[in-house]
Amino acid sequence: MKDMRTAEQTIDEVLNLAAGHFKVPREKLSPDDDFFKTLKIDSLQALDLLTRLEQHFHVELPDYELQGVSDFRTLASRIQARL
């Protein structure tokens, strides 16, 4: 069955999960933020976040779809496309 989340709900969930995972206030994150810069994370930490997001949304994101993705909005749209 197709997931009925809206794009905005997916973005909100991505931001909430990232904030909780990295213990930063949710209000410090916005959809167009570069998560590497905003969260001050490296590629291994980003991979950990991606794994958690895949588990939460029950999706698998191929590496080629994530190349060059660094903002929450684009990441959420890639997730949304797989729901």
Which residues does each predicted region cover?
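Two-component histidine kinase catalytic core, primarily the HATPase_c
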Residues: 45
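Phosphopantetheine-dependent thiolation modules in NRPS/PKS and related acyl-activating systems
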Residues: 2-41, 50, 55-56, 60-83
